[in-house]
């Protein structure tokens, strides 16, 4: 499966200088946030493939005008073409803006989906034994 992953900056190669066939062979597009809704709508239209996204810390506008033709997977466990995808958008808390989370808030978001993760054959792991606060975030396996 070929997956195009995009985030943070629109690619002129795909956006400004698009030519038919440029996205040929792509099976799915994943957006990790901080892109214009119009860019994502363009990609899903031109590729004619599923586009899944999570909002980034600069995507507050998605609430009023989400990308057309795209699926938000923030806080969801989905299966596309046999591939399980768990989406968590946002960033570490730095200014209190939308889609910013403390470690405890992100841990709570993950634990909320614990039953879906386990039902899909995954498991939740607790904090690592490392001392770095960044390394102690809970993760889904």
How would you describe each model-predicted region?
Residues 29, 52, 83:
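Short glycine- and Lys/Arg-enriched binding-loop motifs that mark or flank ligand-binding interfaces
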Residues 1-46, 117, 128:
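N-terminal active-site segment of His-dependent metallophosphoesterases
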Residues 35-39, 56-62:
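Short, polar loop motifs at secondary-structure junctions
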Residues 49-57, 74-75:
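Short hydrophobic/aromatic-enriched beta-strand-loop microsegments
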Residues 5-13, 59-141:
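Conserved catalytic scaffold of divalent metal-dependent phosphoesterases
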Residues 24, 49, 136-137:
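Structured loop/turn residues at beta-strand edges in well-structured enzyme cores
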Residues 47-49, 68:
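A generic structural signal for short beta-strands and their flanking turns/coil linkers
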Residues 31, 54, 87:
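Short glycine/serine/threonine-biased micro-segments
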């Amino acid at each position: 499966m070929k997956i195009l992953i995009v985030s943070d900056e629109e690619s002129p190669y795909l956006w400004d200088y698009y030519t038919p066939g440029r996205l040929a062979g792509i099976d799915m597009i994943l957006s990790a946030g901080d892109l214009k809704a119009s860019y994502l709508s363009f990609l899903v239209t031109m590729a004619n493939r599923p586009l899944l996204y999570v909002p980034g810390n600069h995507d507050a506008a998605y609430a009023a005008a989400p990308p057309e033709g795209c699926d938000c997977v923030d806080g969801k466990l989905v299966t596309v073409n046999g591939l399980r995808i768990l989406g968590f958008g946002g960033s570490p808390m730095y200014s209190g803006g939308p889609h910013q989370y403390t470690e405890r808030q992100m841990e709570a978001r993950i634990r909320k989906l614990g039953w879906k993760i386990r039902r899909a054959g995954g498991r939740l792991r607790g904090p690592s034994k490392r001392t770095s606060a960044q390394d102690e975030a809970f993760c889904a396996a």
